[in-house]
Amino acid sequence: MKVVILNGSPRKGGNTEIMAETFAKAADKHEVEILNIAPMNIKGCLECKYCYAHQGECVQKDDMSKVLEILKDADMVVFASPIYWFDITAQLKTVIDRLYACGSTGFHFNKTALLLNAGADHVFDAAIAQYKAMTSYLKWEDKGIITAPNMVEKGTMKECPELEKVKELAKNL
C-alpha cells in the first residue's frame, strides 16, 4: 500500500514532523512518502471549476500539481498538523481545499488518518469535526485519529505517550 503523509507544519524538526516520521518508520511494510507542504508554493482554490472541465487540471500553475501527481497513486493519506489557532494549519487547509480538483476525476486513495498535536488539550474539536465531515462525505475509511496535547516546546513529542499510538496505528495498517 502506498501511504502519503501530508505534513502541514511549517516548523522543521517540530512535533508534527516527529509524528510523521514515526508513522513512516513504523509503517515499514508499506511504501510511505512524507510531503512537507509548508515550503511549497500552493495558492488557495479559486472555485472557478476549470478543473472540472479539464480532468482535474488546475488553472493555477503552482506546486499543487506535484502534490496531486503523488496522490494519484496513493492508497492512503495521513493528514498531519499542529493546531495553532483551534484548527489545522493554513498550509494543510489550503491543500485540502485544492483537493476539490479531484472531485471531477475521483480519488485513488480511500483510507485516511489524522495526526494532530497542540500546546493545549482543548483545541482539537474543530479539526476533528472537519476531518470527520470530509471522510464521511467522501466515503473515505478513517483508520484513526491521534491527538497529542500539551506539546508546547519543540521536540517534546519525543517523550509523548501518544507517539506509541502513532506507531501502533502505522503497524496495524
Where are these regions (language model features)?
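Short, glycine/serine-rich, charged loops/turns that create anion-binding
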Residues: P10-R11, G119-A120, N150
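Amphipathic, positively biased hydrophobic alpha-helical segments used for protein targeting
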Residues: M19, R98, A129-Q130, N150
